[in-house]
């Protein structure tokens, strides 16, 4: 039987990516989901302190709890996380499922020059909604 020291020496490097909120889960489904910019940033910072190196970030409208691509909310989250961590940020360009936003709104996260962005390369059916990714968006 291996002792702990031997086991840790055999481990390979690992990248842990954390999706702090996603875009669909609500407080009605779980009271623990971060909604405000401060809550989302704090959850990301805590995940980084626990060992995550990549933080996949969606932001929420604090009034509705729903996903948004609002510049000011993204800015607050990004500034707070960058102020306390060296985490790799993966910001979403997917927008909000069921609300097909204008392309310029979906590209707001690029203004923060994240190390990574999520980019859905095709349209997706999500229950009663269709998440559109037409060629005009994909070719931007």
Label each region the model flagged.
Residues 6-32, 118-124:
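N-terminal small/glycine-rich loop or linker at the start of catalytic domains
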Residues 16-20, 55-57, 87-93, 115-119:
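Hydrophobic faces of well-ordered beta-strands that scaffold small-molecule active sites
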Residues 32-42, 72-73, 99-103:
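Glycine-rich anion/phosphate-binding loops
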Residues 40, 47, 58, 117:
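Conserved, mostly hydrophobic/aromatic
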Residues 65-91, 139-140:
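Alpha-helix-loop-beta-strand connector modules within alpha/beta enzyme cores
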Residues 99-140:
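Extended substrate/RNA-proximal surfaces in nucleic-acid metabolism proteins
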